[in-house]
């Protein structure tokens, strides 16, 4: 467990980080069920259980939330070191704002820009796209995340002849593998920033 600042305007950062780890543990439990159900569907050629697709959506939602929280934590610590005091506003608090910030993108997230962009679009499509619920697709040979994007729910933004441009399809295995790499890198960055913050506070 990281010994992060326990008293900040945003609460106990150590507890926030612990909640992230607890959520990751829950995601792992859901993933086991998803892959077991996927095997059952293919082995027994059974109908797709609605809970199977909903569970995949839930994993995406939680991974998005964790990623947003890690980005916010990273930015908070970096700004604390830069200004000498804990910020009272999180200007960078999610994937979208991080992707639009050259500093945090180049310093911490550049290797994961494509992954973050995909996760951002997929989670937004699941949350906002009115046509996304029409999708009832599964992967050819493994669990796959599918999302159908419709910007602002305006059909003028959807070309039926080239619908693939609005369709996202990535394997759950790829999502988890890339997220794990991202999390490990972010954890090291947070550890480094936290150590620097402790050194600065003793001066």
Where in the sequence are the language-model features?
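Acidic, Ser/Thr/Gly/Pro-rich intrinsically disordered interaction regions
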Residues: 1-57, 61, 71-203
């Amino acid at each position: 467990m990281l010994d992060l600042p326990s008293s900040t305007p945003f609460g106990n950062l150590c507890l926030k980080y612990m909640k992230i780890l607890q959520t990751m543990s829950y995601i792992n439990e859901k993933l086991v069920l998803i892959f077991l159900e996927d095997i059952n569907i293919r082995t027994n050629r059974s109908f797709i259980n609605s809970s199977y697709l909903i569970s995949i959506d839930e994993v995406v939602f939680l991974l998005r939330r964790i990623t947003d929280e890690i980005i916010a934590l990273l930015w908070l610590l970096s700004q604390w070191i830069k200004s000498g005091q804990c910020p009272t506003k999180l200007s960078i608090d999610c994937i979208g704002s991080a992707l639009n910030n050259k500093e945090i993108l180049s310093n911490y997230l550049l290797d994961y820009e494509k992954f973050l962009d995909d996760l951002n679009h997929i989670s937004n499509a699941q949350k906002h796209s009115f046509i996304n619920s029409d999708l009832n697709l599964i992967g050819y040979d493994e669990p796959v995340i599918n999302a159908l994007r419709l910007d602002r729910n305006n059909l003028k933004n959807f070309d039926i002849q080239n619908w693939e441009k609005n369709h996202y399809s990535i394997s759950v295995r790829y999502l988890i593998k890339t997220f794990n790499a991202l999390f490990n890198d972010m954890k090291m960055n947070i550890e480094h920033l936290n150590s620097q913050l402790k050194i600065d506070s003793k001066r």
